[in-house]
């Protein structure tokens, strides 16, 4: 944790289906709160290894790669760290792409203070790495994401609307989180 921090570093994870503005929102939030983002590792892994790299072992490597990037980002964060996805969403990807998940995912409990579940009310953009352009597949993935958060009993907030509405809702949620007494 950065020496400028006092108290516990809060973590907020952007969560949801592809092409819902998670990366853009994470970066905008980091600028607003003058902190950093732990980048999405799954995209990097897919760009290097291709879209066929989707076995349970690939998903485990992606999850652990994300944790490494998060640890590095934590050393530069101030008060709050924004994560562009995390191992929990990788578990959902593993279920869908690999037909199941490594048991490591079910033991994973290192949750952020808040998940921001981005709605699918934004247009899907094909970029060569994304999988689910079909509206029904996208909806199915979104519902699987929310079900995973509910199953784990974690704190989350659904955000939707245009990019400015999402940013305003996210800023309000993070402000409220930062105002809470630390545990």
Regions found by a protein language model. Name each.
Residues 14:
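Hydrophobic anchor at the beta1->P-loop junction of P-loop NTPases
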Residues 22:
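Conserved lysine of the Walker
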Residues 2-9:
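Phosphate-binding P-loop
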Residues 27-71:
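Conserved substrate/cofactor phosphate-moiety recognition/catalytic segment
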